Amino acid sequence: HAYGAFVGTRTLSRNVEDVYGSFRFEDTIEDFSAFKIKKVKEKNNAIEFEFEEGGKGKIEIATNIVRLQFESASVETNRLAMSFVCEDTDHFFGLGAQVSAEHRGYRIPIWVSEQGNGKSMQGEPPQVFGLTGAHYDSYSPIPFTLMNRPLGLELDTPHRSEFEFCVDEGPIRLEIQDSTFVLNIYLGS
């Protein structure tokens, strides 16, 4: 299942279509598997944990920031994700140079792509791939969202990632297409 506290999978195949800097990804992936925590310990002012399936993670807490990272033991696992409860009042802003100001109810890919000549509506594909842009194509995507709770969520990665915000009344879901997941949570007041 793609939704869970700690989940991972691997990409079986990837087809990337590129037209003048516009990208379209078609991935075939295995089903996501949940990682279950088996051991937790405090070490050097951090909380470290290990998964039953292998792999490990760490939570570090500093003033106004929580850094959470985890990795799978399998070298084949190259997609990791986390899900969080989405409150009815949650709103999501940011993610770099985006057309929309508020992103609740959408999946937003974080990948540099030519925006095209014109944009499609939220949730709709571009009318002519490579000429018109998908709604969330961006020359400057930034893997950081500011919420109204107040919280900031930053995926600390150079890899392709995705933010999913309460799609179909579902959870907040963050995915990094890499073998290491690093999330910085900024706490406001």
Where do the PLM segments sit?
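Catalytic and substrate-binding clefts that recognize carbohydrates or anionic sugar/phosphate headgroups
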Residues: 1-189
